[in-house]
UniProtKB/Swiss-Prot annotation:
EC identifiers of the protein: 1.2.4.1
Binding sites annotated in the UniProt record for thiamine diphosphate: E61
Name of the featured protein: Pyruvate dehydrogenase E1 component subunit beta
Purpose of the protein: The pyruvate dehydrogenase complex catalyzes the overall conversion of pyruvate to acetyl-CoA and CO(2). It contains multiple copies of three enzymatic components: pyruvate dehydrogenase (E1), dihydrolipoamide acetyltransferase (E2) and lipoamide dehydrogenase (E3).
Binding site residues for K(+): L114, A162, I163, D165, N167
Source organism of this protein record: Cyanidioschyzon merolae (strain NIES-3377 / 10D) (Unicellular red alga)
Length: 326
């Protein structure tokens, strides 16, 4: 049985099911309770589970993130919502020094089963401070898993897996994908956190991407196929750890790769993916890896300039054609 849900509804369904399944699961963050969350992911959950399991907090990311880590240390399973993931920079100390490292620094005595989730990425004129690509900042934190959903289907299955995981998971939801609608199973399903997905099989070139850029890539693929090319498309999903096996298998087949990301180029996810492929599949490559990233500038408020910062489908088409000609 299938039903059609928006992504924000699929995320809510995942949280609802996990709260019903495990009484240790609770939600906390700014306006997650009576207001239902900034994008309505937690709407009406406080009515069902009460104010102690859907906990409204003050506007103090460092405080409630630290509280969630402490709760996780005692055996609870907190799900933190960042009203905007850019604000998690205010809790960088708690996430890096506590959530990411406590299992190691305690000699394995502490586990931190914590999910930190919320809207991020470049939206519609949200300007610089609300358009951070935080995956670049957090990818170097030891002990932290990073997952980026791209569809209602994988959003639900991945969030359920993240809540059940015994490690801290940073769960990235793109602000412009909340209203993406898709048929998903009514019956329970859980997806692996550490596996990339081959979205489209092909033989000519491997296009690696994640989150909202998957949809830009798929627009470009329509044009490439119409021009006689057969690209393979991989949705990374797991940004940390990277599913290297899937990437190497694909590159060993196509012998050419291009990475498309919304992250800034300097220190971005693509830089790490390139390094991993070069380290493990260099001899399989017939050409240097290409990458398309956002500009290394603060995201402008002006709509035209904002779009100029982003990778567009036409740029992907041209980059793939150039790569194919080498």
């Amino acid at each position: 049985m299938l039903h059609k849900l928006f992504m924000y509804e699929a995320l809510r369904e995942a949280i609802d099911e996990e709260m019903a399944r495990d009484k240790r699961v609770f939600v906390l963050g700014e306006d997650v309770g009576h207001y239902g969350g900034s994008y309505k992911v937690t709407k009406q959950l406080h009515t069902k589970y009460g104010d102690l399991r859907v906990l409204d907090t003050p506007i103090a990311e460092n405080s409630f993130t630290g509280m969630a880590i402490g709760a996780a240390m005692t055996g609870l399973k907190p799900v933190v919502e960042g009203m905007n993931l850019s604000f998690l920079l205010l809790a960088f100390n708690q996430i890096s020094n506590n959530a990411g490292m406590l299992h190691y620094t305690s000699g394995g005595n502490w586990s931190i089963p914590l999910v930190i989730r919320g809207p991020g990425g470049i939206g519609k004129q949200l300007s610089a401070e609300h358009s951070q690509r935080i995956e670049a900042y957090f990818q170097a934190v030891p002990g932290l898993k990073i997952v980026a959903c791209s569809t209602p289907y994988n959003a639900k299955g991945l969030l359920k897996a993240a809540i059940r995981d015994n490690n801290p998971v940073l769960f990235l939801e793109h602000v412009l994908l909340y209203n993406l609608k898709q048929e998903i199973p009514k019956q329970e399903y859980v997806l692996p956190l550490d596996k990339a997905q081959v979205v489209r099989e092909g033989s000519d070139v491997t296009i690696i991407t994640y989150s909202r850029m998957l949809h830009h890539v798929m627009q470009a693929v329509k044009q490439l196929v119409a021009q006689g090319m057969n690209p393979e498309v991989i949705d990374l999903i797991s940004l940390k750890p990277i599913d290297l096996e899937t990437l190497v298998t694909s590159v060993s087949k196509t012998h050419k790769a291009i990475i498309v990301e919304e992250c800034m180029q300097t220190g971005g996810i693509a830089a790490e993916v390139m390094a991993q492929i070069y380290s493990h599949a260099f001899d399989e490559l017939d050409a240097p890896i290409r990458r398309l990233s956002s500009k290394d500038v603060p995201t402008p408020y002006n709509g035209y300039l904002e779009q100029a910062c982003l990778v567009q489908p036409t740029q992907i088409v041209e980059a793939v054609k150039t790569l194919m000609s080498t």
